[in-house]
From Swiss-Prot:
<feature type="repeat" description="LRR 14">
    <location>
        <begin position="890"/>
        <end position="911"/>
    </location>
</feature>
<dbReference type="GO" id="GO:0006952">
    <property type="term" value="P:defense response"/>
</dbReference>
<feature type="repeat" description="LRR 5">
    <location>
        <begin position="680"/>
        <end position="701"/>
    </location>
</feature>
<feature type="compositionally biased region" description="Basic and acidic residues">
    <location>
        <begin position="1162"/>
        <end position="1180"/>
    </location>
</feature>
<keyword id="KW-0677">Repeat</keyword>
<feature type="repeat" description="LRR 10">
    <location>
        <begin position="796"/>
        <end position="818"/>
    </location>
</feature>
<dbReference type="InterPro" id="IPR002182">
    <property type="entry name" value="NB-ARC"/>
</dbReference>
<feature type="repeat" description="LRR 7">
    <location>
        <begin position="726"/>
        <end position="748"/>
    </location>
</feature>
<keyword id="KW-0067">ATP-binding</keyword>
<dbReference type="Pfam" id="PF23247">
    <property type="entry name" value="LRR_RPS2"/>
</dbReference>
<feature type="compositionally biased region" description="Polar residues">
    <location>
        <begin position="1185"/>
        <end position="1201"/>
    </location>
</feature>
<comment type="function">
    <text>Potential disease resistance protein.</text>
</comment>
<keyword id="KW-0547">Nucleotide-binding</keyword>
<feature type="repeat" description="LRR 12">
    <location>
        <begin position="843"/>
        <end position="865"/>
    </location>
</feature>
<feature type="repeat" description="LRR 3">
    <location>
        <begin position="517"/>
        <end position="539"/>
    </location>
</feature>
<keyword id="KW-0611">Plant defense</keyword>
<feature type="repeat" description="LRR 13">
    <location>
        <begin position="866"/>
        <end position="888"/>
    </location>
</feature>
Length: 1201
C-alpha cells in the first residue's frame, strides 16, 4: 500500500489547516477522493476548528442544482437562521424575502459575529453545481468582496489540475482508525458469529490474510479503509439485530472468504471492479427482505442512487412521492398508507446510513454504494414506471413544489396568494368528491402535477383536459377510461402516463402532435392495436414504456426524431410481430425501425414476450453519420420472443451487461460476431432456444459470470470455455443432446454452481473435480454417466445431486473432507453402497436415497446430528439401518416407505414430539396395516432394533400414513401440520385420531363426512380433504342446534373435495353452522352439485371451483357480499350463470370456460381492484392463474406413498 494511503486523518487535517495559510490571505484548498472516503467529514472538522478562531463559515452543498441567485441566498440565509425551511402547516409566502433584502440580512448577520475571516466550503463540487456556477454565474464572488481574504475549501470526487490551489488527496483510513470505528461494534459482531466461523477465521489468519482470527480483523481487511463501508455495515447490523440463515451465508461468502475470490465478486457486483468493496456489498445484501416479504425496498434503493446522479439531493418528502410515482407501492388504495410505507423505508435507510440528512431536511445517499451492481434485478428502468427523476433533473421548476400529506391526499402547501399546483390522490379518496366537479374548483385551475391511482369517475378526462398548465399527468389503473382524445390539448406535458386502462382501444394518430415537451410516456396495459405515429416527432422523449399491451401490432418509427430515448420497453406486446410494423410481407416493409444506431443514449431495450422475427441493426456508418457503437446500452431483453430466428451483429453493444433470450424457441442462429467486444457482459442466457451451437467467440467474453443454456435441446457440443475464468454459474440442464464440453475447467476457480442435469454426457468436464470453491454440483438424470471422479477437493461443496443417474455405479474417493455438504441426493442410481465416509458429514441436513434398489444396508449414521430429512423410500432391498437416530434432534422427515426394514431406528424425543415432524411408513414391512392401533406395542415387541418406548403417548398423533399426498395437490397446505389419513373408517381407532386437526378421507364408503366425524369423535378438525368417496351425497348433515351445543365456534377452516360423483350439497339445510369459520374451499369434479351455499359464508377468503357440470350458481341467495374473499378461481363450469354475491375486496380472479356467465348490469359487481374479464376459451389476461402454481410459501413434498 502506498505511503500516501497510510496518512492519518489528523495528518490530513494538519495539511488542510496549513494550506489555508495565514489570516488575511486568500487561499483555496481542494480535497479529492472517492465517494465515501470522508471528505465531508474532514471539511466539518476544519469548520469546527476555524470557527473557534476569527472565522465565519458558510457551507454550500453543491449536490443540488442552484439555478438562480434567489435560491443561492435562501440557502445562505437558512444557514444563518434568517429564514427557515417550511414545515407542515406553514405558508411559504410568509417566509419570502426579496433578493436584495436577503443579501442585506445576510451581511448584517455576518457583521454581528464580529469575525474578519471567512471560510467558504463548497462540498461535493461538480456533482450538480460547479464552483464557477456559484462564484461567477451567480455572483457570489462579488458579494463576498468585502471580505479581503476569503478562504475556500472544496471537496470533489474527481482529480484535476488547478492553478492557485492546493490539492490534497484523501486516502483510506489507517488500520488504527478503522479499528476505532469498529470498536463499539465488537460485542455486536460477537453476537452474530456462527459456530463454524472461528474455523474459517483461523484459516484466514494462518494464511496471513488477516492479523487476528476475529470478525473485526476480517471486516477491517475487506473494507479497504473506506470509512463509509464500515459505518454503513455497523449501522445495518444494529438495525437488523439478528441475521437469517440466508444473511449469514452471504456474510460468510463476502467477509469470511479469501481475498482471491474478491476479483470474481467484483466482476459480478461492481461497475468499476477496481473500486469493489465487499463490506458495502454486504450492507446492500442485508437490505434485501426475506423472500416471503414483498416490500419495495430494493426498488427504492436503486432509485435513490439514480435520483442523486440525475437530480442531486432530495427533500425527504419529495423522495417518498417519487417512489409512489414510479409504482413501487402499487396498487395504491390509500395515498396515506403508501406514504407511510415509503416513510418507513426512508427511515430504515437513514438508520442504516444508506441515506444521510443535510440541512433543511434534504437527504443524500451514501454515494459510494453507486458502484454496486445487481444483475439479478431488472435494472432501474425495468421496475420504474416513469423515470421521473431524469425528467425533473433537480430543476425545482419541473418538480412537485412544496407539498404536504393531508386528508389522504398529497397536495401543494396552499398559501393565501397561490392556488394548488400538485394533487396526488387515490380513487377511494376521490369518491368523497362530487364527480366531475373536483378539478373545476377555482383553486385547482393552476394545477401542474396530477397523479391519480385507480380513479373511478367517468368525467375524469373531460375535467383534466381543461387544466392547460399540466406538466405531469398520471392516471394509473382506471378501467373506466375508454377515450382520452381530449387530453391531446395538454401541450405543456413533460410526463404522461395512462396505464391499466384495459377498455382503451384507440388513441388518435395526431394525439401527440402538439406535445413537443413530452419526455416520459407510459401507456402500459392498454388494448390499443396501434401506437400514434406522432410519437415519432417527440424529440425530447426519454422513456417509452408500453408494457403488457397485448393487442399492440406496431411501433412508432424511433429513428425519426426520438434520439434522446433511454428506455424502450414493450414487454408483453404479444401481437407485435413481423418488422415492428403491421406489414405481413418483406416486400411491403419500408425500413421502419430498421436501425437503432442513432439512439445513442439508449440504456434499456426490452422486447420480451413479443413476436418480433428480427432485431434492429445497431450500427450505422455513412457520409454523415458514424455510429459504430452503442456504448450506453446495458440490457437487451428478448425473453420468450418465440418467433425470433437469429441474432444480428451485436458487436456495437460494447457495454452490454445482460443478453437474455431465454424462451426464444425459434432462435436458430447466433453470429460469431455477436459476442465480440463484450468485455462487460456478465449474464448470457440462451435457455430454451433452438440454437444448434454456441458461438466460438464465447471464449472472449472473459468477464462472464453466468452462462445459462437450459433446455437447448439441439446443442450437441460446446466450444472451449476455459478462458471464462470469472464464471460463477454454468447451467446446461436439459440439453439432452449435449455429449461434449470442450476445454478444461481447471482455471475457473470462482465457479460455484454447475448444473449438468438431463444431458447426454458420459463423463464430467475436465478438472471440474478440482474446483475447491464449487458449492452446487447438480447432475440429475444423466443416464449415460457410469462413474464420477474423485471429489475430495470440492471442500466447499454444499449440494450434491446425482438423482436419476440410473447407470451410476461408482463414486470414487472419500467424502471425508466435504464438511460443508448439507444436501446429498443419490436417488434412482445404481449404487450398491454409499460414498466412502459420507457418514462423517456432521453438517448434512438432507440425505435422500429414494429408489436405490441395489442398496442393502446403510453405514452407521449417528454422526449426522444435523440431519433434517432422511428418505430411503423405494429402497426395496434395504433391510437394516444401523444404530439409533436418537441424537438427530433436528430431524423433521423420515420416509421409510417401500423398504424391507424389519425394525425401526430409535428417534429423538424432541423431534418426534414436535408438531411439524412427519414419519412416512406406507408399504413398509416395519408395521403391518392391522397393527396401527397397537403401534407402540408392536414396535416395542420387535426382537431387533429400537422402539418408540421412550417418546410417550403423543407419538401416535405424529405418524403420517398417506396424507403427504395432499402437499402435492395443494401447495398452500402449511409445512407445520400433519394430515391423518382415514382411507377406511376402521384403519385407526377413535382414541388415536379424536384429537386430529387435519384429516384426509379417500375412497371411504361412508355417506357423509359428519358421520365419520361423529363415529371417530373428531371435534377439532381445522382442515379436511375428501376425494373419491362414491357414496357421499352430502358432506355435513348434523343438526345445527346440536353443533352449537358442542362448540360455540366451529373449527373447520379448510375444505378440499374432489371426485364425489353423487354429491348434491355441501350440507343439509340444518347443518350450515359448521362453515361459520371456513376460510378456504376447493371443489373439483363434483358433477351433480347445483349450488354451493344457501347462505353467505362470511369468513371465506379463497374459493376455487372447477369441473362441476351442473353447477348453476355459487350462492343460493338473491344478493350478498363476501367482504373477505381475496381469491376466486372458476374453471369449466358449463351451466354456471349467476355468482350470487358481491366481492368488494377481491385481489385475484380467474374465470375460464364459463360460457353462460355473462356480466350484466344487474349482476353484483366484483371489487374495483380486479378487472374481471370472463372468457370461454382464454384465461384472464391480467391475472395470475390458480395459486397452486405460485404458493404463498414453499412446501416440501416427498413422493406420494
Amino acid at each position: 500500500m502506498e505511503k500516501q494511503d497510510q496518512t492519518s486523518r489528523e495528518e490530513i487535517l494538519k495539511k488542510i489547516m496549513d494550506s489555508l495559510g495565514q489570516d488575511g490571505v486568500p487561499s483555496k484548498t481542494v480535497l479529492v477522493g472517492e465517494a465515501g472516503i470522508g471528505k465531508t467529514w474532514l471539511a466539518k472538522e476544519v469548520s469546527q476548528r476555524v470557527t473557534q478562531e476569527k472565522y465565519n463559515v458558510l457551507w454550500l452543498h453543491l449536490n443540488k442544482k442552484i439555478e438562480d441567485e434567489k435560491s443561492l441566498y435562501e440557502i445562505l440565509a437558512a444557514q444563518l437562521s434568517i429564514i427557515y425551511e417550511f414545515e407542515e402547516g406553514e405558508e411559504p409566502d410568509e417566509l419570502d424575502y426579496p433578493l436584495e433584502s436577503l443579501k442585506e440580512k445576510i451581511k448584517e448577520e455576518m457583521i454581528k459575529h464580529k469575525k474578519d475571516n471567512l471560510l467558504l466550503i463548497l462540498d461535493d463540487e461538480g456533482s450538480m453545481t460547479t464552483e464557477e456556477d456559484v462564484m461567477q454565474e451567480l455572483n457570489l464572488q462579488d458579494f463576498l468582496k468585502e471580505y479581503s481574504a476569503v478562504k475556500i475549501l472544496v471537496t470533489r470526487r474527481d482529480e484535476r489540475e488547478e492553478k492557485e490551489s492546493t490539492t490534497i488527496k484523501v486516502g483510506p483510513l489507517t488500520e488504527k482508525e478503522s479499528l476505532d470505528l469498529l470498536h463499539d461494534a465488537e460485542d455486536l459482531l460477537t453476537s452474530f458469529t456462527s459456530e463454524d466461523w472461528p474455523v474459517l477465521l483461523k484459516r484466514l489468519c494462518d494464511n496471513k490474510e488477516i492479523k487476528e482470527p476475529t470478525l473485526m480483523s476480517c471486516i477491517l481487511s475487506k473494507s479497504k479503509g473506506l470509512p463509509a463501508a464500515i459505518v454503513v455495515l455497523i449501522k445495518s447490523l444494529n438495525s437488523i439485530k439478528s441475521m437469517s440463515a440466508k444473511q449469514r451465508k452471504i456474510f460468510k461468502e463476502l467477509i469470511l472468504s479469501s481475498k482471491s475470490l474478491d476479483e470474481a465478486a467484483a466482476s459480478k457486483n461492481a461497475i468499476d471492479r477496481s473500486r469493489y468493496n465487499p463490506v458495502l456489498q454486504l450492507s446492500y445484501e442485508l437490505l434485501k427482505p426475506d423472500e416471503t416479504v414483498k416490500r419495495p425496498v430494493i426498488a427504492c434503493f436503486w432509485h435513490i442512487l439514480d435520483f442523486y446522479k440525475y437530480s442531486g439531493c432530495a427533500y425527504y418528502r419529495d423522495l417518498i412521492v417519487h417512489w409512489m410515482l414510479e409504482g413501487y407501492f402499487d396498487p395504491v388504495k390509500s395515498v396515506d398508507k403508501a406514504y407511510q410505507e415509503g416513510h418507513s423505508i426512508l427511515m430504515d435507510f437513514m438508520n442504516r446510513g444508506i441515506l444521510k440528512i443535510q440541512e433543511d431536511n434534504m437527504v443524500v445517499p451514501e454515494f459510494s454504494m453507486s458502484n454496486l451492481l445487481d444483475l439479478q434485478d431488472c435494472g432501474f428502468f425495468g421496475r420504474s414506471s416513469l423515470g421521473f427523476d431524469r425528467v425533473y433533473g433537480g430543476d425545482k421548476r419541473k418538480g412537485l413544489g412544496k407539498i404536504i400529506l393531508i386528508d389522504d391526499m398529497i397536495q401543494t402547501i396552499q398559501s393565501k396568494k397561490k392556488n394548488i399546483t400538485t394533487i396526488i390522490a387515490s380513487g377511494n379518496r376521490l369518491r368523497r368528491e362530487v364527480h366531475g366537479k373536483f378539478f373545476e374548483k377555482p383553486e385547482m385551475q393552476d394545477l401542474e402535477v396530477v397523479v391519480l391511482f385507480e380513479p373511478t369517475f367517468h368525467e375524469l378526462v373531460l375535467s383534466l383536459s381543461k387544466l392547460k398548465k399540466l406538466r405531469v399527468l398520471v392516471i394509473r389503473d382506471c378501467d373506466l377510461i375508454d377515450n382520452i382524445d381530449k387530453l391531446s390539448g395538454l401541450q405543456g406535458l413533460h410526463v404522461l402516463e395512462v396505464s391499466g386502462a384495459s377498455s382503451l382501444v384507440n388513441i388518435p394518430d395526431d394525439f401527440f402532435k402538439n406535445m413537443t415537451q413530452l419526455q416520459s410516456l407510459n401507456l402500459s396495459g392498454l388494448a390499443i392495436k396501434s401506437s400514434p405515429s406522432t410519437i415519432e416527432k417527440l424529440s425530447m422523449l426519454r422513456c417509452f414504456i408500453l408494457r403488457h399491451c397485448s393487442e399492440l401490432q406496431d411501433l412508432p418509427n424511433f429513428i425519426v426524431e426520438t434520439r434522446k430515448l433511454e428506455v424502450i420497453d414493450i414487454h408483453g406486446a404479444r401481437k407485435l410481430e413481423s418488422y415492428f410494423d403491421r406489414v405481413k410481407d418483406w416486400k411491403d416493409y419500408k425500413g421502419k425501425n430498421k436501425n437503432f444506431a442513432q439512439l445513442q443514449l439508449l440504456e434499456h431495450l426490452d422486447f420480451s414476450e413479443t413476436k418480433i422475427i428480427r432485431l434492429p441493426i445497431f450500427h450505422l456508418k455513412d457520409s454523415t453519420n458514424d455510429f459504430s457503437t452503442m456504448p450506453i446500452l446495458t440490457r437487451l431483453l428478448l425473453r420468450n420472443c418465440t418467433r425470433l430466428k437469429r441474432l444480428p451483429q451485436l458487436r456495437p453493444l460494447t457495454n452490454l451487461q445482460i443478453l437474455d433470450a431465454c424462451g426464444a424457441t425459434d432462435l436458430v442462429e447466433m453470429l460469431e460476431v455477436c459476442l465480440e467486444e463484450k468485455k462487460e457482459l456478465r449474464i448470457l442466457d440462451m435457455s430454451k432456444t433452438s440454437l444448434p451451437e454456441l458461438a466460438d467467440t464465447i471464449a472472449d467474453v472473459v468477464n462472464l459470470n453466468k452462462l445459462l443454456l437450459r433446455n437447448c435441446s439441439l446443442i450437441e457440443e460446446l466450444p472451449s470455455i476455459e478462458k471464462l475464468t470469472h464464471l460463477e454459474v454454468f447451467d446446461v440442464s436439459g440439453c439432452i443432446k449435449l455429449k461434449n464440453i470442450n476445454g478444461s475447467f481447471g482455471e475457473m476457480s470462482y465457479l460455484h454452481e454447475v448444473n449438468l442435469s438431463e444431458t447426454n454426457l458420459s463423463e464430467l468436464p475436465d478438472k471440474i473435480s478440482e474446483l475447491s470453491n464449487l458449492k452446487e454440483l447438480i447432475i440429475r438424470k444423466c443416464s449415460k454417466l457410469k462413474t464420477l471422479p474423485n471429489l475430495e477437493k470440492l471442500t466447499n461443496l454444499e449440494i450434491f445431486d446425482v438423482s436419476g443417474c440410473t447407470e451410476l455405479e461408482t463414486i470414487e474417493g472419500s467424502f471425508e473432507n466435504l464438511s460443508c455438504l448439507h444436501k446429498v441426493n443419490l436417488s434412482e442410481t445404481n449404487l450398491g453402497e454409499l460414498p466412502n465416509k459420507i457418514s462423517e458429514l456432521s453438517n448434512l441436513k438432507e440425505l435422500i436415497l429414494r429408489n436405490c434398489s441395489k442398496l442393502k444396508a446403510l453405514p452407521n449414521l449417528e454422526k449426522l446430528t444435523h440431519l433434517v430429512i432422511f428418505d430411503v423410500s423405494g429402497c426395496t432391498n434395504l433391510d437394516k439401518i444401523e444404530e439409533s437416530f436418537e441424537s438427530m434432534s433436528y430431524l423433521c422427515e423420515v420416509n421409510l416407505s417401500g423398504t424391507n426394514l424389519k425394525t425401526f431406528p430409535e428417534l429423538p424425543k424432541q423431534s418426534i414430539l414436535c408438531s411439524s415432524k412427519r414419519i412416512v411408513l406406507a408399504d413398509s414391512s416395519c408395521i403391518e396395516r392391522d397393527q396401527w392401533s397397537q403401534i407402540k406395542e408392536c414396535l416395542t415387541s420387535k426382537s431387533e432394533g429400537s422402539s418408540f418406548s421412550n417418546v410417550g403417548e403423543k407419538t401416535r398423533e405424529k405418524l403420517l400414513y398417506h396424507g403427504n399426498r395432499y402437499r402435492v395437490i395443494d401447495p398452500e397446505v402449511p409445512l407445520n401440520i400433519d394430515i391423518v389419513d382415514i382411507k377406511r373408517s376402521t384403519d385407526l381407532k377413535t382414541e388415536y385420531i379424536a384429537k386430529a386437526e387435519y384429516v384426509s378421507i379417500a375412497e371411504n364408503g361412508s355417506k357423509s363426512v359428519s358421520s365419520l366425524f361423529d363415529e371417530l369423535q373428531m371435534a377439532s378438525v381445522k382442515g379436511c380433504w375428501v376425494e373419491r368417496c362414491k357414496n357421499m351425497d352430502v358432506l355435513f348433515e348434523s343438526d345445527e342446534q346440536l353443533e352449537k351445543e358442542k362448540s360455540s365456534s366451529p373449527s373447520l377452516q379448510t375444505l378440499w373435495i374432489s371426485n364425489l360423483p353423487l354429491l348434491t350439497s355441501l350440507y343439509s339445510s340444518k347443518g350450515g353452522f359448521i362453515f361459520k369459520n371456513l376460510k378456504k374451499l376447493s371443489v373439483d369434479c363434483c358433477p351433480s352439485i347445483k349450488w354451493l351455499f344457501p347462505e353467505i359464508p362470511d369468513n371465506l377468503e379463497i374459493l376455487r371451483v372447477k369441473f362441476c357440470d351442473k353447477l348453476e350458481r355459487l350462492f343460493e341467495v338473491k344478493a350478498g357480499e363476501l367482504s373477505k374473499l381475496r381469491k376466486l378461481h372458476l374453471l369449466d363450469l358449463p351451466v354456471l350463470s349467476v355468482l350470487g354475491a358481491n366481492f368488494p375486496n377481491l385481489e385475484k380472479c380467474t374465470i375460464e370456460k364459463c360460457p353462460k356467465l355473462k356480466a350484466r348490469e344487474d349482476e353484483p359487481r366484483i371489487g374495483a381492484r380486479i378487472t374481471d374479464e370472463i372468457s370461454e376459451d382464454q384465461p384472464h389476461k391480467n391475472t395470475i392463474g390458480p395459486e397452486t402454481q405460485t404458493p404463498t410459501q414453499p412446501t416440501k413434498a416427498t413422493d406420494t406413498v
